[in-house]
Amino acid sequence: MKRHLKGSVRLLAALILLLTARQAPAQTLSGDALVNALRHGGYVLVARHASSPREAPAKQSANADNVNLERQLDDNGRATAVAMGKALRELKIPIGEVFTSPTYRALETVRLAQLPNPRTQAELGDDGQSMQGVAESQLAWLRKKVTQFPMGSNTILVTHQPNIAGAFPQWVSSLSDGETLVLGPDGKGGATLVARIKIEQWPNLKF
């Protein structure tokens, strides 16, 4: 009986420590500390799609699978998306869920980065090619999603600048093409900004 009680006490203590750790506010991180944190998981990465011309391509210059002639990545966007994905794999950063805008340029970013098992999410979309407005329901979905921190992996959301700036004006007014916000728990049930990573910085991160 005593042995069983001691075992239960140890289990309860371990659960309390785990919950406390997950509720503790995340710290601003960079360099090795950032990579180490991402390797342990528990973060949500919100990324703008890689570099894309503002004009949709003509039929002659469109990618073969871009049947709707949507905006697509330029050469720099394609190269940096590939490099980002390669860095994530080489750094052994675990990726769990991946959600992406259904736009072609976002899907192309995810495909070239080879992010695992992506799912399109309408709320991450751009409200049409004009980018003139993002519905409040989209911003609410994004704000809620970034508070759902995974255990042992990281969630990636690929979307657009108006969505990110609209949902998180306290952290950012604009992002460069492909830039990522790394969000962690704020200790109060919400999210806080841990780091900003420009897409060209991923290959320079080391562990």
Predicted regions and their residues:
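N-terminal signal peptide c-region/cleavage motif recognized by signal peptidases
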Residues: 21-23
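Generic beta-sheet signal
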Residues: 42-44, 151-159
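Histidine-centered catalytic micro-motifs
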Residues: 47-52, 157-164
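Short, solvent-exposed loop/turn segments at secondary-structure junctions
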Residues: 128, 165-166
